[in-house]
Every structure is written in structure tokens, then in C-alpha cells.
Amino acid sequence: MEIEVGEPEAQRLKLPWCREAHWRETLPAMLNELDPGPIELDCRDWQLGCRDLHQLRELLNKEGVTLTRIHANLRETLVSAAALGYPTHMASPQGNSSKTRSSDTQPKPKTPQKLLFHQGTLRSGDHLSAEGDVLLLGDVNPGARISAGGDVMVWGRLRGIAHAGQDGDTKAKIVALQLRPLQLRIADAVARGPEDQPQPGLAEEARLEGDTIMIEPARANRFNG
């Protein structure tokens, strides 16, 4: 784990890479080296849920340090951070590859999609749109729309209209804690939402298989934490 100066008057705490050490083992020593004040956390390639980030925040607060921003290489970690209300930044995976690899042969990382975080319920007539992925902490009521160039993630009830992959991305997904929309769209495919009652406490995921939109229980890491 490393500490460096980020933006003016803000430290940056870097967790170790997964292959180097577990962050829980190295954190206590690093906490003793922190100066009171704002800090940015770089989670690198760790997949951290809301509980993990909440625990980190509490440990930092005890040292008089305020967490202001979270960087990560994994989208799942950024989703958890955004759900807690933190500004996020998708970091490039540099430094996690072999040091012996030539810079000429090292593949360039794929440019990450931006994650738009919005807190609040969308009501009839509202439309929330994002170029990349979108995470909504709230409900999408009937008559409201949510759309994204990438994934649509709703930490609540989706009962309006959702369009993922609006620019043609057939790999995009729609995830919600309760997926009962009036209409689903992924790329150019269109489907109506299911009419049966969802299983309590089970998030659902819509994805494209061929030309058909399939709905199934969401993978655990879609709403990690």
C-alpha cells in the first residue's frame, strides 16, 4: 500500500495489488502514516462492496481522515462507491501487468466507460440518460425513462422504461432490485417486462441472447456489498 499526494491538500491511499498482499493485512500500518485531512482512496484491482468501503471509511475517520474520492480498476467497486455517494474515477490497469513486458508489446487498456450516478426517484415524465453506464439509487416510476450507452443499474424498483446499449451495444445489461418495467430495450431489441411477482430480496438482470431479451437472477457482483 502506498501514500502519495493527489489533488492539492489531498492525500491518496493506494491499496496493494491483489497479487501482492491483502489490503486488510497492510492497512493497519498505513493508517499510522496518514495525516489528518482529506484523502482519495485508490482500490486498484480489488472488488470491494459497500460493506468493505464503509469499513474503510470508518477506519479512516478514526484517524481523522476524510474520504473524498474513490479510484478503482473494477466497475463493481465504482458502483459500490457511487451507491455510497462518493465521486468515482475509473483508473487504467497500468502497474498490474508484468514489469518485464516491453511497452511496445503491452496492449493498451480499453478506454473505460464513464459511470453516471444519480440519487433520487424518477417520476412520470422524467428521463435520465448517460453516455456510458448509469447507476440510479432510487426507483423508476411508470412513465419515467432511463437510458444508457452501457449498462442500466437501478438500486430500487424499475417500473418505467429502460434502454441499455442505446448506441448498439448488445453486451449491455439492465439490472434492478425489482425488474418490472413497462418496456425493456437492449440495443435494438425490445421486450415487455415480466408480469409475475419478483422473488423478495432477489435482484434481476436482463441481457440479450441472440435477438431475445432474457431475464434471470442477477450475478452477485452486480450489486456487490
UniProtKB/Swiss-Prot annotation:
InterPro entries: CAP/MinC_C, MinC, MinC_C_sf, Septum_form_inhib_MinC_C
UniProt KW Cell division keyword: yes
Keywords: Cell cycle, Cell division, Septation
Sequence segments annotated as region (Disordered): 87-112
Gene3D superfamilies: 2.160.20.70
Transmembrane segments: none
GO biological process, alphabetically ordered: cell morphogenesis; division septum assembly; regulation of cell septum assembly
Organism superkingdom: Bacteria
Compositional bias segments (type: Polar residues): 91-108
Subunit structure: Interacts with MinD and FtsZ.
Function comment: Cell division inhibitor that blocks the formation of polar Z ring septums. Rapidly oscillates between the poles of the cell to destabilize FtsZ filaments that have formed before they mature into polar Z rings. Prevents FtsZ polymerization.
Similarity annotation: Belongs to the MinC family.
Protein name (record): Probable septum site-determining protein MinC
Organism: Prochlorococcus marinus (strain MIT 9313)
